[in-house]
């Protein structure tokens, strides 16, 4: 009987030690009052931070109707700072995420207030986004959650690429042009260019030597004769109400000999997917792959 009692007592002591260690680990995280000032900062931290009490506020850039409801609903319980540096300082965070293009003045204000800042650049490739996410996971002590999310991204990319290879076996890479309603496209050094490479396509704007975002004339579109045209639409996360825009291009007489128009391979895509720099980049790549190769879900 005494042996059983001692065993039970030892188990209780061990359980308490484990709980104390877990509690201690949570309390010793370097940053526990975090605020992101960007859309992608909101997106990354909402998925990365397991204990949401460590998020003091969000940037407020995730808007209803411009993203899936599931993502928007995750933001409802948080205060939104909306680029108000004074409000950020009043909330007394110990870490603020801010992008380099937001300006040295804002960064200096935060640092002068004794707040640590994580200043980062816009990712231009899948690998750069991968690296950024790893660094952020390390910074906020969420390495395991970070590994889990990155593993999911890599597995989904591998699966998509396998589907594409199977469907396009023995076929040349599709010649693709992003062509906005204001005659803009994306060339060398853009995230979109890297996404097209990842789905084994040819970005015609890059092949023309265009760097970054730039204009492309209707005459040039006709001249390069793309096999697939992608039309980006602002604020769209679903394909509702886009038929009118599609028909404008399909019924344009000057485009009637363009291969993409003749074969009705003109597709509407959400503009957000050109510039998405969070773990949701994989959603954008999947969307592009499914549109370009007409893959089933």
What positions do the PLM features span?
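His/Asp/Glu-enriched short active-site or ligand-binding loop at hydrolase and phosphoryl-transfer sites
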Residues: 59-62, 191-213, 268
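A short, structured surface patch at a secondary-structure boundary
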Residues: 33-91, 95-101, 201-204
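Bacterial N-terminal signal peptides
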Residues: 8-19
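Positively charged n-region of N-terminal signal peptides that target proteins for export
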Residues: 1-6
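Short helices/loops that flank or line small-molecule/ion binding pockets
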Residues: 85-92, 113, 215-225
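Short secondary-structure boundary segments
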Residues: 38, 100, 228, 232-236, ...
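Extracytoplasmic substrate-binding proteins
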Residues: 28-33, 106-180, 184, 205-206, ...
